[in-house]
UniProtKB/Swiss-Prot annotation:
Subunit details: May associate with the eukaryotic translation initiation factor 3 (eIF-3) complex.
GO annotation (BP), single: intracellular distribution of mitochondria
Bias type Polar residues, positions: 1153-1184
Principal subcellular localization: cytoplasm
Keywords associated with the record: Cytoplasm, Repeat, TPR repeat
Cross-referenced CDD domains: CLU-central
Gene source species: Emericella nidulans (strain FGSC A4 / ATCC 38163 / CBS 112.46 / NRRL 194 / M139) (Aspergillus nidulans)
PROSITE patterns: CLU, TPR
Keyword Cytoplasm in record: yes
Annotated compartments: Cytoplasm
Task of the protein: mRNA-binding protein involved in proper cytoplasmic distribution of mitochondria.
Protein name: Clustered mitochondria protein homolog
GO cellular component terms attached to this protein's record: cytoplasm
All copies of domain Clu, residue ranges: 281-532
Length: 1225
């Protein structure tokens, strides 16, 4: 996007003052590279001229967008640009505009409005002026795209005292308030107008439309005056209408009553408008721009907790040229935008379908078999309405199949195979229903000639009829090669053989537009035969349990590695006799290379091995009912089956145990919630159905993986509850969805408060829905627990413990349930246990979602104690039993969207090239490529996108490592905001982004701000996981070190102690991790003037290092040195204190009791040296000099001994550094 120097004061200066005189030279030098240069834009109104920084590769529409968003040119929305008197096409690049160069002047010319333009202008101004109000959005829900970054930073900046910091009085083991993830209350923005709305006289009659009337508006200014305004093709003017008289023609008023922009017209009508609008802009500028930036190419995150209350275009992009980099940028940018637009439109339509607001095309069919077309998008239910999946598991199989189909289409879109097209596809889960939305493939509804199949390639009617078409072979061959699919035979119902490139379930359709479409990609990988054959007890709900694409890729890499090693061994054996000396020399060379380049010998051999002879592909149709006919076919089929079995065995014997071991050893980041756990499993190629097996493996590892075991069990319970809730929600009338969810949540999470909850249903409303399914009313806590246990056993083959519901982490479970069902709950302190419910005699929230029900209840109780009998309504409310959730707590249910949008391959290629260059020590080239990747990410995705957040995060770490701290902080800040808005204010990624930002802020000298970020991250951690997360050890250590930097030694000590407590519980008291923290804690205790405790902790650290690492290890030696020094100082201080105590006793005998105990113990911020200052010279050999040296020793000050300096350097760097690394385990 074009860059502007949009400050108002700049635009008032002359162009000569602003323009860089060297720009012309820069343009000439960088012409080929699309260098930046500056042009002027002449405006019809103030400020009459602005300067815009542009690139020759940008399009004119980018310049347009910059003008629309610039504060000084807000009023322009309907205009075109001219250069040398000729209109410029918005969609050409600036380099294609004849004669345009640095310092050229283009002219903005206002255009006549259409009704669309007028409406867009009014909507834009309502948003700019803060008069838009809250729009009900069925897709994004309440507070979608929320960011808390600015309020966290503001809280840190509000600490006035030097000794104030965010972690003061922080309760480390305590619970976190739910307010942590709610938007902070803000002062209301300055009001510019009271209202802008459509007039009751709108729309204009036909005869006035012919005269150019577009809309009639009604504006009420801050002064209280009401104006009726006509939107005309020429602009806006005040008309003669009143509330009772229609006369939409211009009114003669003292002031000028017309303008091309509504903004300018309001400015003329309201004397206070300009000042109020300027104040509003200043208020908005206090926020980070990213927190208010509109979403373009991604769906914003909808928080689970809120404050109480087009087909052809998708295919056309694939046919765009891709020869040059600019072609690819334009193509991927357009693809990203079109997918985002399609996904949003499809999701909105899916919600309407789920709500029953779209008429079906086949209303006489059963509900699950009904199909819909809305907004040119084809919708159906993810259920087996016509019996297609009858043998695979019916509705369960159909639901899984459509989810797998989206993943398959996404993989094909990512491969971007020339000549192969996919329909735009989206799956939406909403109110228990799964809806599939697809762009209509041209020809899919076409009636074929007799004898012709509806499908041109693949299975036509299940597997009974198989079609082949030579045109599909080349494109399917490319697809199969990329996805490791083996070409194989299948047989139809007549046992006729057909050779297919893909699964028989994958279909090819030749569209009437001449394009080749691939459909039904839910079986691009083989069935997990090991899982299907392992059934004991009730059968798994469906037979769609396939392997993940990530696992197939991992298996391929493992087999390739085996092939390379075998090839190397074969070569060595062949050459061993004839070239022993040469081989020895070669091995010597290899060993040198191994030392210098840190590469394994196998990797070097691998570089020399030609892997073109290696091939591995899996047959996706084995174990799915195919019957080979000849002996040769049977033999080949048996080999295919063996290969698939080996892949399944690879998952169970290699991948899953490796993951558990990596988590045990701390080699991977520990998951925090269900979302991060699922991402970790999917990345490794592990299906969610293996949660039970993983839980068993984790339990075998003991207490170190107790947190993982808890998380795995919680995830199984949440997913079982989701399936149960969806079953009830599916047929519940929409007005009762909140009652259904609240009742089921009460049965799961509120049974301790009320063992017999009853569903809250409006009986008069219920009568309107005689066919509604209200079976959820009959659910009891006991029945729900039994059903959850059954579902966990059925789906995950894991048996929950008998009292599993007593060990639930209620808030974390509620959060995961809300996220998986799309619930948005009213924020309040939910009552989960009897202890919390004690004293509550009334319903916690009786009248709404304000989150103040408990406070109101307590006030009512106080009044009753004082003799106030209360109203009859209040008495009735008091008789209601206490329940944890009421229907009013369910503020909204948002749709959960699974899309098939591809990532940008160009941006990822640039990023990967940059990383490789940096690894090769080509720093300048690497940074240029990474910055290019950043530019591509922002151009293609827009700024607000999860992929851009990920890149900001990676780049911030890169800049931090290269010691460019300011850039690191800026990018980390952007990463936080974009992550909050796209993934959620309390997502695991948001926590990691805040922790990163805190480290960078501390490194930049902003330690107080860093502590505010750590405090917020710790609060988020408590909400999404609870206390004692394994990765929190490092965070608490970092907080302690930062507090030491602020000389807050007492607080620092508390955080080290908290870190030690978590570490001991996870790794045991004799682990090296524990010893490292003990080492740091001993230093902190010395700084806090607790010499005796410091000696004890250092001795513990030394003993652990000695037993675990031996006496010669560097850690052991350093701990021993510190122990000697601390012991020496502790003895001196104790001796000193004993002498002072003796003098104090003598004073007591002489009757001077006033000083007893008042100055012996050091106060906060006071050293022992201060206390012992009155001592006599006779004590000089044991005075406070040693403790001062110790303080300097720990803090890095100078001492007289060079030996002490060496010890100091080693201790100040190595143990802490190693400690932070190990503790992160």
């Amino acid at each position: 996007m074009a860059q502007t120097n949009g400050e108002m004061e700049h635009s008032k200066e002359s162009p000569e003052q602003i323009t860089n005189g060297n720009n012309q030279e820069v343009v000439q030098e960088d012409d080929g590279a699309g260098g930046l240069f500056q042009i002027s834009v002449k405006l019809p109104h103030e400020p009459y001229k602005i300067q815009v920084m542009v690139s020759s590769q940008e399009q004119v529409q980018d310049v347009r967008q910059s003008i629309v968003e610039l504060p000084g040119t807000f009023q322009y929305t309907c205009f075109h640009l001219e250069f040398n008197g000729k209109r410029i096409n918005d969609f050409v690049e600036l380099s294609e505009v004849p004669g345009l160069q640095a310092d050229s002047e283009i002219v903005l010319v206002e255009d006549p409005y259409t009704e669309k333009d007028a409406r867009m202008h009014v909507v834009r101004l309502r948003e700019l002026l803060g008069a838009a109000g809250d729009r009900v959005d069925t897709i994004n829900g309440v507070n979608a795209g929320l960011s808390l970054h600015d309020s966290i930073a503001a809280e840190a900046g509000s600490e006035k005292s030097e000794k104030e910091h965010s972690l003061a009085k922080y309760d480390i083991p305590g619970s976190s308030s739910l307010k942590t993830i709610l938007p902070r209350s803000e002062a209301p923005a300055p009001k510019t107008v009271k209202s802008i709305s459509l007039s009751p006289w709108n729309p204009p009659p036909h005869h006035l439309r012919q005269k150019g009337h577009l809309l009639y508006l009604q504006v009420t200014t801050n002064e209280g005056e009401q104006f009726q305004i006509t939107s005309h093709v020429s602009g806006f003017f005040v008309n003669k209408c009143s509330n009772s008289r229609f006369d939409p023609f211009p009114k003669t008023i003292p002031k000028k009553g017309s303008a091309h922009s509504l903004l300018n017209l309001i400015s003329q009508l309201s004397p206070s408008f300009d000042a109020a609008f300027k104040e509003l802009q200043e208020s908005n500028n206090q926020k980070d721009l990213l927190t208010t930036f509109p979403f373009q190419n991604s769906i914003p995150s909808s928080p689970w907790l809120v404050a109480p209350p087009a087909s052809n275009s998708l295919q056309t992009t694939k046919e765009l040229p891709r020869e040059t980099v600019q072609d690819r940028v334009f193509r991927e940018r357009l693809t990203s935008k079109l997918f985002a637009d399609y996904n949003e439109a499809a999701a909105r339509g899916a919600v309407l379908v789920a709500r029953g607001e779209v008429a079906p095309l086949n209303p006489t069919e059963a509900q699950d078999a009904q199909i819909f077309v809305y907004n040119n998008i084809f919708y159906s239910f993810g259920a087996d309405g016509v019996g297609t999946f009858a043998s695979e598991g019916g509705d369960e199989a159909a639901r899984v199949a459509v989810g797998k189909d989206v993943l398959g289409i996404k993989a094909v879109n990512q491969l971007d195979i020339n000549g192969l097209f996919t329909p735009g596809t989206i799956v939406v889960d909403y109110m228990g229903k799964r809806i599939v939305g697809q762009s209509i493939v041209p020809g899919i509804f076409k009636q074929r000639e007799p004898g012709e199949h509806q499908i041109d390639y693949g299975g036509v009617e299940g597997k009974d009829v198989v079609a082949t078409h030579p045109d599909f072979v080349p494109v399917f061959e490319k697809l199969s090669k990329a996805l490791r699919i083996k070409k194989h035979p299948v047989w139809d119902k007549d046992n006729q053989r057909h050779d297919l490139e893909g699964s028989v379930e994958t279909k090819g359709l030749l569209g009437t537009d001449g394009r080749k479409y691939v459909l039904d990609l839910y079986r691009v990988t083989p069935l997990d035969v090991a899982w299907n054959e392992e059934e004991d007890g009730d059968a798994y709900p469906h037979r769609m349990s396939v392997l993940r694409l990530e696992l197939v890729e991992s298996y391929w890499r493992a087999k390739m590695s085996q092939y390379v090693k075998a090839e190397v061994e074969r070569r060595r054996a062949a050459k061993a006799e004839e070239a022993a000396k040469k081989e020895k020399s070669s091995e010597d060379t290899e060993s040198k290379e191994e030392g210098s380049e840190e590469k394994s010998e196998e990797a070097l051999d691998q570089e020399r091995v030609d892997i073109s002879g290696f091939s591995l592909a899996l047959n996706p149709d084995v174990f799915s009912g195919q019957i080979p006919q000849t002996d040769e076919e049977k033999e080949q089929w048996a080999q295919d089956e063996k290969e698939v079995r080996d892949a399944c065995d690879f998952l169970r014997s290699k991948v899953m145990p490796e993951l558990i071991q990596d988590l045990h050893d701390g080699d991977v980041g520990f998951p925090m919630d269900g979302q991060s756990l699922s991402q970790l499993l999917h990345k490794r190629g592990i299906n969610i159905r293996y949660l039970g097996k993983l839980a068993t493996l984790a339990k075998e590892k003991g207490s170190r993986l107790e947190a993982l075991s808890t998380l795995l069990v919680q995830e199984m319970v949440v997913r079982a509850f989701k399936h149960i809730t969806n079953k009830y929600l599916r047929n519940v009338p929409a007005p009762f969805a909140a009652s259904c969810v609240a009742h089921l949540l009460n049965c799961l999470l509120g049974a301790d408060v009320n063992a017999t909850p009853r569903a809250e249903i409006d009986s008069s409303l219920r009568e309107i829905y005689p066919e509604g399914d209200f079976s959820f009313e009959k659910v009891t806590p006991e029945a729900l627990r039994a059903e959850i246990e059954k579902q966990v056993t059925l789906r995950y083959r894991f048996n929950l413990e008998s009292q599993w519901f007593n060990s639930l982490r209620h808030l974390q479970l509620l959060r995961d349930i809300a996220i998986k069902l799309g619930l948005q709950l009213a924020a309040r302190d939910f009552v989960f246990t009897k202890a919390q419910a004690e004293g509550l005699k009334v319903l916690p929230v009786a009248n709404g979602v304000n989150g103040t029900g408990q406070d109101e209840g307590s006030k009512k109780k106080k009044k009753n104690k004082n003799g106030d009998s209360g109203s009859p309504a209040r008495s009735a409310a008091a008789e209601k039993p206490i329940v944890t959730f009421t229907p009013d707590d369910i503020v909204n249910i948002v749709p959960l969207v699974k899309d098939a949008s591809p990532r940008s391959s160009l941006a990822e290629e640039a990023l990967e090239a940059g990383r490789i260059s940096l690894m090769q020590n080509q720093k300048q080239l690497g940074q240029e490529l990474i910055l290019e990747s950043l530019s591509l990410h922002e151009q293609i995705y827009g700024i607000l996108h999860p992929e851009v957040a990920k890149l900001y995060h990676q780049l911030s770490m890169l800049y931090y490592q290269t010691d460019e701290k300011d850039a690191a902080v800026e990018l980390a800040r952007k990463a936080v905001i974009v992550t909050e808005r796209t993934l959620g204010v309390d997502s695991a990624d948001t926590i990691l982004s805040y922790l990163n930002l805190s480290l960078f802020e501390h490194a930049s000298g902003n330690t107080k701000v860093a502590l505010a970020y750590i405090k917020h991250a710790m609060d988020l951690w408590k909400i999404i996981f609870g206390s004692n997360h394994p990765d929190s050890i490092t965070t608490m250590n970092n907080a302690a070190v930062m507090l030491q930097h602020l000389k807050q030694y007492s607080d620092s000590r508390k955080w080290f102690e908290a870190s030690l407590s978590v570490c001991e519980s996870l790794f045991g008291k004799q682990s090296i991790n524990t010893a490292t923290i003990l080492f740091q804690l001993a230093q902190a205790l010395a700084l806090d003037q607790d010499s005796k405790a410091a000696v004890g902790k250092m001795r513990d650290a030394y003993n652990i290092f000695l037993s675990q690492l031996g006496p010669e290890d560097r850690n052991t030696k350093e701990a021993e040195t510190w122990l000697e020094q601390l012991t020496q100082n502790a003895v001196s201080i104790a001796k000193h204190a004993k002498d002072i105590q003796a003098r104090r006793l003598r004073r007591i005998n002489m009757g001077t009791r006033t000083t007893l105990g008042t100055q012996i113990q050091p106060q906060v911020g006071q050293s022992t040296a201060d206390v012992s200052a009155p001592s006599q010279a006779s004590n000089s050999s044991i005075d406070s000099r040693n403790i001062d040296e110790l303080l300097k020793f720990i803090e890095g000050g100078d001492t007289s001994s060079s030996r002490t300096k060496q010890k100091k350097r080693a201790a100040a760097s190595n143990p802490k550094l190693r400690g932070s690394k190990k503790s992160s385990a």
